[in-house]
Design a protein with these regions (language model features):
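C-terminal motif of bacterial Sec signal peptides marking the signal peptidase cleavage site
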Residues: 15-20
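Short, polar/charged alpha-helical segment
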Residues: 40-65
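Short helix-initiation/N-cap motifs at beta->coil->alpha
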Residues: 64-75, 163-191
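Ligand-binding "clamshell"
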Residues: 95-107, 122-123, 195, 208-219
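A conserved helix-loop-strand patch within extracytoplasmic ligand-binding domains
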Residues: 107-156, 255-256
Length: 272
């Protein structure tokens, strides 16, 4: 009787260990079922149309989980509810890690929609005049992008001692046109564009507002830390599935997709 009980116990332990190993495999480096955060905008759409089919051909099953904003997307990624996202640049991710105690890692730059100066009441950069009113985004990373772009246009000069990725309105040292700036939520800018002489908006806002990107009067020179990235948890960065996603973005199939479908919206990072 004791022998039977011992055998039964041993079998039960073996079964539990096997189940544990199976669970580890499902959640480990070689897993084939992946969950990603998604939102309305060009980046999720680009992934789903141009990258997802490449991964599915390799046997992956991919499930999108809708998120209301990027902060929520990073929280659920950091907590392990999703495996990756493709909607943020390095500057945003690093700010999240610092402010929220995150442990996220950027893997590879991916196509990015640049910020631009777009028409408001005026439709030509040459129409700039004293006292003109310009709308710019109010979140830190995109505010800096906006002022860097306005400097590129020659309308202001920023303190050269400051990092362009962190400049604010306070860093303007020359404003020859005495321009007025209103910093506001990016999503709200397109709806009030005719209240301003010019507006500065990011690519995702251009896309969501269905603004023709070819109407941009000037676009930014995208700094490396403002390129969109494939982002995962730090502990997953060496997983095979992460490499496969990165490889898909750099594949011949994806390049062909971009050549066919890029209508002037996307800046595509150069291969190193």
């Amino acid at each position: 009787m004791k022998l039977r009980k011992w055998i039964a116990a041993a079998l039960a332990i073996t079964a539990l260990l096997a189940a544990g190993c199976g669970s580890q495999s499902d959640n480990g480096a070689d897993k084939k079922e992946l969950v990603y955060s998604k939102s309305q905008g060009p980046y999720s759409e680009l992934f789903e149309q141009g990258v997802k089919p490449i991964l599915e051909a390799k046997g992956y099953k991919l499930v999108g989980k809708d998120m209301s904003d990027l902060l929520q997307a990073d929280v659920v990624l950091n907590d392990g509810e999703v495996d990756f996202n493709v909607e943020q640049h390095t500057a945003y991710m690093e700010n999240f890690n610092q402010k929220q105690g995150g442990k996220l890692a950027a893997i590879t730059p991916i196509p990015t929609v640049p910020a631009g100066i777009y028409p408001g009441k005026k439709s030509d950069l040459k129409e700039i005049a004293a006292g003109d009113h310009i709308a710019v985004p109010n979140d830190a990373a995109n505010t800096a992008r906006a002022y860097a772009l306005l400097q590129k246009a020659g309308w202001i000069k920023l303190n050269p001692q400051k990092d362009l990725s962190t400049v604010t309105q306070a860093d303007i040292i020359e404003n020859p046109y005495n321009l007025r700036f209103t910093e506001m939520k990016s999503l709200n800018i397109p709806a009030v564009r005719t209240d301003f002489d010019f507006i500065v908006i990011t690519g995702s806002i251009v896309y969501n507002a269905k603004i023709n990107p070819q109407t941009a009067l000037l676009t930014e020179d995208i700094l490396p830390h403002l390129l969109l990235q494939l982002v995962v948890r730090e502990k997953d960065k060496d997983a095979k599935w992460v490499k496969d996603i990165a490889d898909a973005y750099h594949s011949v199939e994806f390049k062909e997709y971009m050549q066919k479908n890029n209508k002037g919206l996307w800046y595509v990072p150069e291969e190193k």
